[in-house]
Amino acid sequence: MFHQIYSIHVMIDGTMTPVVYALLPGESQFVSTRFFTLLKEHMSRLNLSFTPTRAFADFEVAVHNAIRQVIPGIIIKGCFFHFTQCVWKKAQTTGLQIFYRDNEEVRTLIRRAAVLPPIPLDRMEDVWFQALEDLEDADIPHNTQPFTDYITEQWVEGDRLVWNHFGTEGTRTTNNIEAWHGKLKRKAQHSHPNIFTIIQTFKEIQNSNDINRIQREAGGTIRPRAKKYLNILPSSCHPERKIPEQSNRFDDLADSASQLLHLG
């Protein structure tokens, strides 16, 4: 009857909090559009506004199209972490991961691709094409073209506004939501729980969130984010702290930031 659990989370007092829980029968654009339409209608009946200006979502075209159809003008951003996963998965399918650990030039190529999101849009092509030029003199015992073609065609020539995070304020990943789904699975204690177990789990999680919210409002402490996540995107992501826009500086920035990524 149901194919997936879908949740919507919002930032409340600096904490990403689930506010909508849904059981969907599929992953198609029709299903996603129907879900967001019903949600919008339900909120209207409750006299609540449903006019978000920005949404974070996985890189799923069906979901993006559905959100844009129901909420015209919304800005959709993809998860930076999922972007790096897409890059690493392509490195695996094209055979480059075999050389990643021992070949510095392969490692640099993959990392430069993975760290494109924090580079300014008007400099991003320069950084990537510089990486391609560097390949001409590289000693790589494997064909890199399937990988570089994928990065160029899928991302550099694709919808850059979705995955580029230069200037993005606040969170740039959905890692906290992934952690929430992990918590949900542990609480359900079954790989295929029945609907009653799922609903009960939703209630328990919501009760826990309500308690945490009350504690925060009463002045309780909030567990700080891990420092590595705070620092993973450097100052280039914030317009007020731009570095001088020379191409070689952004090459250096890409290489430096890539050291914070955990690939392989």
Regions found by a protein language model. Name each.
Residues 1-48:
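Electropositive, glycine- and tryptophan-enriched low-complexity nucleic-acid-binding patches
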Residues 41-242, 262-264:
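Extended amphipathic alpha-helical interaction segments
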